[in-house]
Amino acid sequence: MNFITQVTISIVLYFIARISIKRSSSLYIASIIATSSYILMYLFLYQSITLLPTIHFLVTGLSLIVLFISYYEIVLLERNVRKIKLGLFENAESFPIERSYKLVFNILGVGLVFLSLALISGFAIQSIFTNNLIIKTTFTIIAWFIYLITLIGIKFLNFPIKYATRGLFISMWAVLFAYLANSYLIYN
């Protein structure tokens, strides 16, 4: 099972847990299920484990998972805020907008830490001047900058949620393109 398949399975487990658990802590429980399932799959499937490549693949997978989680949560938040503005939200008083913003901001921070660790560990394990790694490194750095700008924009510049959503969407696809293009170049 390859890297992208493991991440995809973990994200599917996140959505299953997030939808099926009907408590206020469902985000935390689903996130723990997704991240721990990825870590366990990785450690179970790869018998020869060396420290630096293992750290790199773990933090890279975790950064992708957290990127998907943050994108989903920010889209969900934007949808709920729009419903409140239009008067379509049934329990508008019970929906904590400020707490939801803080939660999304914390998720973005965790994702940025994982993406930064993935970049640092990637630079540490290999030279970036091989053909397949140039594409992966370039798009990961682009995603990191977009992610950082989104995080700074939300925290200090009061970006509207729609800009954060667009930034996360572009960042998510830049990271996915980096790994899919890398896989294509390796196997062809």
How does the language model describe each region?
Residues 82-97:
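Juxtamembrane inter-helical linkers in multi-pass membrane proteins
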Residues 120-149:
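Short alpha-helical packing/oligomerization segments
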Residues 153-173:
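Interfacial loop-to-transmembrane junctions
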Residues 24-35, 164-170:
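Cytoplasmic-side transmembrane-helix entry/capping segments in multi-pass membrane proteins
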Residues 20, 43-51, 120-129, 184-186:
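Juxtamembrane "helix-exit" motif on the non-cytosolic side of transmembrane helices
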Residues 6-15, 60-81, 142-151:
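Hydrophobic cores of alpha-helical transmembrane segments in multi-pass inner/ER membrane proteins
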Residues 1-3, 49-60, 129-139, 163-167:
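Non-cytosolic membrane-interface motifs at loop->transmembrane helix junctions
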Residues 177-188:
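Juxtamembrane boundary at the C-terminal end of a transmembrane helix
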